[in-house]
């Protein structure tokens, strides 16, 4: 089973996730998709690099009326961090930038309004945390991500319009509405107890 990790701690696999089920997204390291669906939705976003392109596609698939499923009986071997190391400022940049772009493209108007208020505060906190740790390159990467995201606004608006035109489905009930990190810090150490 794909390991669930939060704050570099991995939840023990005790068979709690052995059933196939619908999920919001699956890891690109273990991703299979019908070719006709992949082509119809334009595949992975060419503007994303190595981070969140699979989440973006899974979100778009569901908005277009398709399902995303996890099949735990599968076996996949994957070298994590093979493209970029965990502490790489480039990884921090792509994580922040691509996540902002994905949210802008795929989220509902209400979700986007919440993100517009909360996200700058959270990203500023993340940047300041990097600075306090002496990781100035990661601090700057967060602001570069915002700069690039804001420059993309025109092309992202076009992509958002295309996604909305294909919209026949919903992700209602599939997106967790709380903070996984906060629940973890409050003592709910397994994903089963967080949800």
Give the residues covered by each predicted segment.
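Short, conserved glycine- and acidic-residue-centered signature motifs
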Residues: 50-51, 92
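Glycine-rich phosphate/pyrophosphate-binding loop
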Residues: 11-23, 32, 157-195
